[in-house]
Amino acid sequence: MIPPAQDYASSRASFLDLVRAAGSVVESHLHPEQGPAGEELACDVARFGAPPGDAATVVLISSGLHGVEGHAGWGLQRLLVESGRLATLKPSVAVVLVHAVNPFGFAW
């Protein structure tokens, strides 16, 4: 079963903790609005594998675009990171995880 997110804020915190623990550097793009509890909203991007410019293949996996699907999408990203497979990528491959393309929609 896919472990869905309970809400945007806990999903984002878990995403950031998990991908950083797995060795990724995260780039965050802040949204100008705030979430329902006044929390910061951001689209967070984590990259694994080959650095920019060195990858022959890049796989982009988004948790979702509109918002509501972000709950299940984060669950899939979580399963992938926890599987350990991102640590065994070929040298020419990169995987980019995008958490919450639309953090406003995800949060509300």
Name each model feature, range by range.
Residues 1-108:
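Structured catalytic-domain cores with a bias toward divalent-metal coordination
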